[in-house]
A protein has these predicted regions:
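Cytochrome P450
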Residues: 1-401
């Protein structure tokens, strides 16, 4: 009898979770997990049903579990600003208002206008490794690129960017919830406090002297007479900083790693760069940066043959859903011609990732720059994987060019 169960602390949770997902889909696609005190969903249809259902909440405070109580206690250590409403953790109508006010900065047209600047940044980073036979993609490209992009959007000067990346990394490291070690929590608490001090000053300065940047835009944003409160501006700015850094770094690292492990697909893309948009979608499906997320039932809800009771958590495995053969034939094969437009790497429903157009653009432009510059590119060693069971990615990816 197979006793497969989702184990976020297992040895393969970071290096390669996909074989474990396959076992779950085949033997225990829906099950109650005592460690999480949550229902685990591994199949595409069930995962999407949870994400799309209006009676599932993104607000973890609605959960009634020991796990959630531990998360709340952890948040309390970070102060009230960590519990302020954000698009990520709120429901309509609050979520609708926040998203409508913030979304103006991330429209496809706004991102399209950023493409030339993104290419300039990447070219500058590649100039920094010119003449070298080997370099680490994460250290030299994937790590600095998104922090430069989001810092420029927010109007953060170059000398402060290293602090922004450090703050972001420290906070993201706590996404393991109660599985996070006390020293990681303390480091995140200190970084969040530094971020609070910095952003409070930046917001006050923009109120006095508005600029052409995102912080000023959030202050000025108005919809039907509604504006963002001070706490909402602050929490939204921090959310954009964190979401715009770690996930994009992992997207780029995971994508390059996948291509180098499938040289036939790399050569296919090299021979036809018009495939780039669909290629990035397939790379997101195949090995996306966000592996899981959770929702809380507002009332008893039937999903996947079980009843998720009010206050219980539904933990959905996005990475598993994207490898479900019932949705994607031959899912373990990387196929850049697949065009998997309905993958769940960015989620689905009202909480679909607002920054998806920007993340796609950064990945597309980075891959094209690497292909155009280097006629030959290969791994100079195995990737080192890191992150959490929620957000995972290459921490080191040595390349030989």
């Amino acid at each position: 009898m197979v006793t497969a169960e989702f184990n976020p602390l297992g040895p393969d949770a970071l290096s390669n979770p996909y074989p474990g997902y396959k076992i779950l889909r085949e033997h225990r696609p829906v099950h109650w997990n005592e460690l999480f005190e949550a229902w685990i969903f591994a199949r595409y249809d069930d995962v999407d049903a949870v994400l799309m259902h209006p009676r599932f909440s993104a607000d973890r405070a609605k959960a009634r579990t020991r796990f959630s109580e531990m998360v709340r206690q952890q948040q309390e250590q970070f102060g009230p600003f960590s519990q302020a409403p954000t698009m990520l953790t709120s429901d309509p109508p609050e979520h609708t208002r926040l998203r409508r006010l913030v979304s103006k900065a991330f429209t496809p047209r706004a991102v399209e206008n950023l493409r030339p600047r993104i290419r300039e940044i990447i070219n500058g980073l590649l100039d920094g490794v010119a003449g070298r036979d080997t370099f680490d993609l994460v250290d030299e490209i994937a790590y600095p690129l998104p922090v430069i992009v989001i810092a420029e959007l927010l109007g953060v000067p170059p000398e402060d960017r290293a602090d922004f990346k450090r703050w972001s990394n420290d906070v993201v490291a706590t996404l393991g919830g109660p599985f996070t070690s006390p020293d990681v929590i303390e480091r995140a608490r200190a970084s969040l406090q530094e971020m609070v001090t910095y952003m409070s000053g930046a917001i006050a300065e923009r109120r006095a002297n508005p600029r052409e940047d995102l912080i000023s835009g959030l202050i000025a944003a108005e919809d039907d007479g509604q504006v963002l409160s001070e706490m909402e501006i602050f929490s939204t700015t921090i959310l954009l900083l964190i979401a715009g850094n770690e996930t994009t770094t992992n997207l780029i690292g995971n994508a390059v790693s996948s291509l180098l492990k499938h040289p036939d697909q790399l050569e296919l893309l090299r021979s036809d760069l018009s495939l780039m948009p669909s290629a990035v979608e397939e790379l997101l499906r195949f090995n996306g940066p966000v592996q899981a997320t959770g929702r809380v039932a507002k009332e008893d809800i039937e999903v996947g043959g079980v009843t998720v009771k009010e206050g219980q958590v539904a933990f959905v495995l996005l990475g598993s859903a994207n490898h479900d053969p019932a949705k994607f034939p031959d899912p373990e094969r990387l196929d850049l011609r697949r065009r998997p437009t309905d993958h769940l790497a960015f989620g689905d429903g009202i909480h679909f990732c607002l920054g998806a157009p920007l993340a796609r653009a950064e990945a597309q432009i980075t891959l094209q720059a690497l292909i155009e510059l280097y006629p030959r590119i290969e791994m100079a060693g195995e990737p080192t994987w890191g992150g959490t069971f929620i957000i995972r990615g290459a921490r080191k990816l040595p390349l030989r060019v």
